[in-house]
């Protein structure tokens, strides 16, 4: 009995070892292409198993992914390893596949005004050492920055110049001069950025004044300022004789989340019917108004054209300087007097008629 149990245990151990080896060892018709630098494995084998899987190939996909991952891990274990802080690390080779960049290449940094001038004049920068000898402290110190050599800000005594006011605070004057230098450097930096981006910077003299604002612009600005509150100008105080603002926005009314399901279904079906219909939806009122508007425009254009023709016909002059048609101008003689054909006057002025007394006073005998 004991010998039989030992044989069973040995057989079970051999079976487990075989299963482990089977999990590690994967057979492929075509070997995979590996790019260990990018941890990439490309499988060129035809997916015959996936074609035979049917409509649900999830299990086959998992098995295929597991086999390919196992082959990739086997390749990683063949790389040279080293121990770093109680951990085994493998050095990956250089990647062979070029991956596309997520973002474009960075643009070269634009040159400052001094760099442009130095390039134009051929000035080359001279490298200066970071440390210089400080005679006051007797040691090497930084050229710039904190604990620099010849740091005049740490002096407790400042000599007053002969041309300066003896009552002026030289320490405050030095601090103010430093602030001005910092502000000037910042302004130059912003100008360089604006020049690089081709922007227009305001002048040091100040912003240019704006033009005269009309009544409409001031009213529009006042209306925008009034509605720029949390209540959209609803609780804003008004002047005694101020009118209510026009065009105040109306509150949107949304449909309730839980309501008439039949009406909602009807609206959705109507929307789908309109979207699926091949014929365009015709608005009779809008089409009629458009047709009437076009007819009115055509009539107005025709009248305008006729009036222009009449003006040209009555305003042209002949070679002798006389008008062809139209009322006579200054300096022209009327042909035919008062009874001419072109300008007819009342019959009482043109001649006698029976039963009509003559006008213009008594006649002389």
Swiss-Prot record:
Locate the compositionally biased regions of type Basic and acidic residues. Answer: 235-245
What the entry lists under Pfam families is as follows: RRS1 (PF04939)
Q: What is its main location?
A: nucleus
Q: Would I find Ubl conjugation among this entry's keywords?
A: yes
Q: Does the keyword Transmembrane helix apply?
A: no
Spell out which residues are annotated as carrying N-acetylmethionine: 1
Keyword list, A-Z: Acetylation, Citrullination, Isopeptide bond, Nucleus, Ribosome biogenesis, Ubl conjugation
Annotated region (Disordered), positions in chain: 200-255, 281-365
Function, in words: Involved in ribosomal large subunit assembly. May regulate the localization of the 5S RNP/5S ribonucleoprotein particle to the nucleolus.
Q: What is this protein called?
A: Ribosome biogenesis regulatory protein homolog
What is the scientific name of the source organism?
A: Mus musculus (Mouse)
Which gene produces this protein?
Rrs1
